[in-house]
């Protein structure tokens, strides 16, 4: 049932059958995003019943026979459909996963995937920022803003950030 958080329920559900290009992930951390609230409320209609969440991290516990670049035991993260990260485990197409570097925790990986994709879109695709350019970034203290400012600095851009409380 769609609605507020009071409509959420903890239930046992069967995982979908794995395909040859899928992996089974045991979640160790998940990301919480505005889009999850949109799915839950019905603002972005989704078929129900629904397991929320599009961002997570975990350990591969099973790999389909066609999966070559990932193996059981790999730490991976994702930010893409199908929904279902609000669960202990998830079947996921292997080509939608990235390995988590050893120096990044599962919690950080799960929390930055969607924000990082947003920043990549802004600083590489919307406008390909180059070293020496100046960028004004509003909401620099938010999740996207913090990643953007670090990314822009790494590129060599001069960053001017704005923040506010209202």
List where the protein language model places each region.
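Cofactor-binding loop segments of dinucleotide-utilizing enzymes, especially the Rossmann-like FAD-
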Residues: 1, 28, 164-165
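Extracellular beta-rich ligand/substrate-recognition surface
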Residues: 1-7
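Conserved hydrophobic/aromatic beta-strand scaffold that supports enzyme active sites
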Residues: 10-15, 57-59, 89-91, 97, ...
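Glycine-rich beta-strand-centered segment in the early N-terminal region that forms part
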Residues: 14-31, 41-84
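NAD(P)H dinucleotide-binding glycine-rich loop of Rossmann-like/cofactor-binding domains
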Residues: 76-139
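Gly/Ala-rich phosphate-binding loop of Rossmann-like dinucleotide-binding domains
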Residues: 119, 149, 153
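Adenosine-nucleotide cofactor-binding segment
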Residues: 137, 153-166
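Hydrophobic/small residue at the entry helix of a nucleotide-binding pocket
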Residues: 143-144
């Amino acid at each position: 049932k769609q609605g507020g958080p009071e409509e959420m329920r903890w239930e046992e559900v069967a995982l979908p059958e794995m395909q040859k290009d899928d992996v089974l992930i045991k979640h160790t951390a998940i990301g919480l995003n505005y889009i999850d609230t949109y799915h839950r409320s019905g603002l972005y209609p989704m078929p129900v019943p629904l397991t929320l969440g599009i961002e997570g991290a975990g350990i591969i516990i099973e790999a389909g026979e066609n999966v070559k670049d990932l193996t059981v035991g790999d730490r991976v993260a994702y930010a893409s459909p199908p929904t279902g990260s609000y669960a202990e485990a998830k079947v996921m197409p292997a080509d939608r996963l990235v390995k988590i570097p050893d120096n990044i925790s599962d919690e950080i990986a799960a929390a930055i995937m969607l924000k990082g994709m947003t920043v990549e879109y802004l600083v590489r695709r919307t406008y390909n920022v180059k070293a020496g350019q100046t960028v004004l970034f509003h909401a620099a203290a938010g999740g996207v803003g913090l990643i953007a400012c670090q990314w822009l600095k790494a590129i060599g851009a001069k960053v001017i950030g704005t923040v506010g409380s209202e």
